[in-house]
Amino acid sequence: MSRSNQEALADFVADAPPGELNQVVEAISTVVDGNSSILSKLETDVHNKILDQCMVVSLGKSKSLVSKYNQLSKDTFYDSQSGQKFEFDFDTKKATPSGSHGSDSPIQGALDKYFSAHFPSEGAAGVFPQDDGSIALVLVDGKYNPANYWNGKWRSVYIFESGSLSGTIDVDVHYYEDGNVRLKSSEKVDLGSVSESDIVDAISKAEQQFQEKLNKSFNGLNEDSFKALRRQLPVTRSKINWGKSISNYRLGKDINVGGGRE
């Protein structure tokens, strides 16, 4: 396969909708007729996709994240909430506890409280100190309902460095029943100078503003753009006699086909 074709397949993986990575890889496998050489080259792209999207995994009775921010080695990660270290299988998408890892950030408790108050229970949030002295705060949650043809995900990542806080908020929603509609929204936020004790409050305000802006844009889209796509009924300015003359209209003829009322 040419380099351009391989890059195109990599783009498909990178743009896989939330909760649908396995289906995308299976579809590619079908298209290339199970070519092991092509599929092996995609492994790196799949791994990068998982790390970039900060995949949520089950770790015992709790949830944790698989991301570059809490990666200790190729397949080893840690959970900042429980202080556990775990191995992650990129093929089966399963996490297995493998020991303890010191994690005692005072920010974690405040972040957990905020996360549990504003997000459903299918996600996870973590505080991960980085080698360069910065701190990464990652919040990920999603709702997946393939039985009703829709999936959605929220991912926000913030970096606290030298007293300043900045980050990116991403929302990705896919609806695919009798069609294919996808909402993707991403916004970079610069929250400026923030004390460590005020980090979570700053995040809360930024995400509230983002959600309000997103709701406003969506309502405008529904009222204006989508409304313009609808077929408008013609204005005839003629009156309809809903009494004796109803049978003269096509609707009346259709109603009277059965010859009576049940």
Curated annotation (Swiss-Prot):
Its main location: cytoplasm. One of its GO terms (cellular component) is cortical cytoskeleton. InterPro entries: CapZ_alpha, CapZ_alpha/beta, CapZ_alpha/beta_2, CapZ_alpha_1, F-actin_cap_asu_CS. GO terms for biological process: actin cytoskeleton organization; barbed-end actin filament capping. Gene3D superfamilies: F-actin capping protein, alpha subunit, F-actin capping protein, beta subunit. Belongs to the F-actin-capping protein alpha subunit family. This is F-actin-capping protein subunit alpha. It comes from Yarrowia lipolytica (strain CLIB 122 / E 150) (Yeast). The lineage of its organism: Eukaryota, Fungi, Dikarya, Ascomycota, Saccharomycotina.
